[in-house]
UniProtKB/Swiss-Prot annotation:
This is GTPase Obg. An essential GTPase which binds GTP, GDP and possibly (p)ppGpp with moderate affinity, with high nucleotide exchange rates and a fairly low GTP hydrolysis rate. Plays a role in control of the cell cycle, stress response, ribosome biogenesis and in those bacteria that undergo differentiation, in morphogenesis control. Its EC number is 3.6.5.-. Belongs to the TRAFAC class OBG-HflX-like GTPase superfamily. OBG GTPase family. Monomer. It comes from Xylella fastidiosa (strain M12). GO terms for cellular component: cytoplasm.
Length: 357
């Protein structure tokens, strides 16, 4: 299935039914009076978060959604039937934006979340409401109100605990295959991952979390180069960022880069930090661990020396790991440490919740 994380739709609520002008007509009752019923309310349009969906691809084929109009009122004080609501299922993590005002009107973060995006019109009043001492036979009724109409932009931000980021071909997809049941496409060329992949990592029988493999970023991602802004926003909800670097990207004796992703390890770190800061400085405040991958492409001692030199040059103080995603060596300790971090984050959040009461 193609991954689609943006869509624009039009939602149209149903108009209210018109009120009825009618008079009671029965034998032996010459002056029955008005008995026109009210029109039914128009149906509304709702968005509902559905955990079974993970893409907005369906909205590429259907963009206009209409709720039913309310039925007109009838004689004998019969009210019109209300129009049926229109329910639109969206993936968890969908942000809803009013295109006309550019206002965020909703954020669907839990399964079953409901959001009213277009309210149906109220049904019109029948003529029975307009009877008075001076107007015993009103021929007046009100039409139903118009339903709301909006154009909405839907943006999907993946709900993942861990977001993996790095330049193309550093081994993110291989890593997610190593630690989860996900099977993203893997090959030895850049941009293998064209859409974000999600994997579930199970630590114990009842302990698991979600990891997102975001497509490789390139310079200018914050400006939209290579669909960068679409991919970067998937990192905003994560609790931890794993910054993957190809440690095998070295230079020859003349200083020419000859293997790896085309950037030296220190450049991979610094250039990506620039993109994160330009897109959303808050991303740099998230816990971010360095994962130095492809250690299997050189002797173990050389890989360790390169890693320690890089950490020293970066003045890196956060956790870092030297791994081989292909052989899975060193990958599991990262996952265990991540689970420990998440448990600590939950404890802190619980304490803050209690203290704020």
């Amino acid at each position: 299935m193609k991954f689609v994380d943006e869509a624009e739709i039009q939602v149209i609520a149903g108009n209210g039914g018109d009120g009825c002008v009618s008079f009671r007509r029965e034998k032996f009752i010459p002056l029955g009076g008005p008995d026109g019923g009210d029109g039914g309310d128009g149906g509304s349009v709702w968005l509902v978060a559905d955990e079974n969906l993970n893409t907005l691809v369906d909205f590429r084929h259907e963009r206009i959604f209409k709720a039913q109009r309310g039925v007109n009122g009838m004689g004998q004080q019969m009210y019109g039937k209300a129009g049926q609501d229109k329910i639109i299922s969206v993936p968890i993590g969908t942000v809803v934006i009013n295109v006309q005002t550019d206002e965020v009107i909703g954020d669907m973060v839990r399964h079953g979340d409901r959001l009213l995006v277009a309210k149906g019109g109220t049904g019109g009043l029948g003529n029975m409401h307009f009877k008075s001492s001076i107007n015993r036979a009103p021929r007046q009724a009100r039409p139903g109100e118009l339903g709301e109409e909006r154009t909405l932009k839907l943006e999907l931000k993946l709900l993942a605990d861990i977001g993996m980021l790095g330049f193309p071909n550093v081994g993110k997809s291989t890593f997610i295959r190593a630690v989860s049941a996900a099977t993203p496409k893997v090959a030895d060329y850049p941009f293998t991952t064209l859409y974000p992949n999600l994997g579930v990592v199970k630590i114990e029988a009842y302990s698991s979390f979600v990891i997102a493999d975001v497509p490789g970023l390139i310079e200018g991602a914050a400006d939209g180069v290579g669909l960068g802004t679409q991919f970067l926003r998937h990192l905003q909800r994560t609790k931890l960022l794993l910054h993957m670097v190809d440690i095998s990207a070295t230079a020859d004796a003349y200083g020419n880069e000859k293997v790896g992703v085309g950037l030296l390890p220190i450049e991979q770190v610094r250039k990506l930090e620039i993109e994160l800061e330009r897109h959303d400085p808050a991303l740099l405040d998230k816990p971010r661990w360095l994962v130095l991958n492809k250690a299997d492409l050189m002797p173990q001692e050389d890989a360790q020396d390169l890693a320690e030199a890089l950490i020293a040059e970066l003045h890196w103080t956060a956790p870092w790991y030297l791994v081989s995603a292909v052989s899975r060596e060193g990958t599991w300790p990262i996952m265990k440490s991540a689970m420990t971090l998440f448990e600590h984050q939950r404890e802190v959040a619980a304490e803050q919740s209690v203290s704020s009461r």
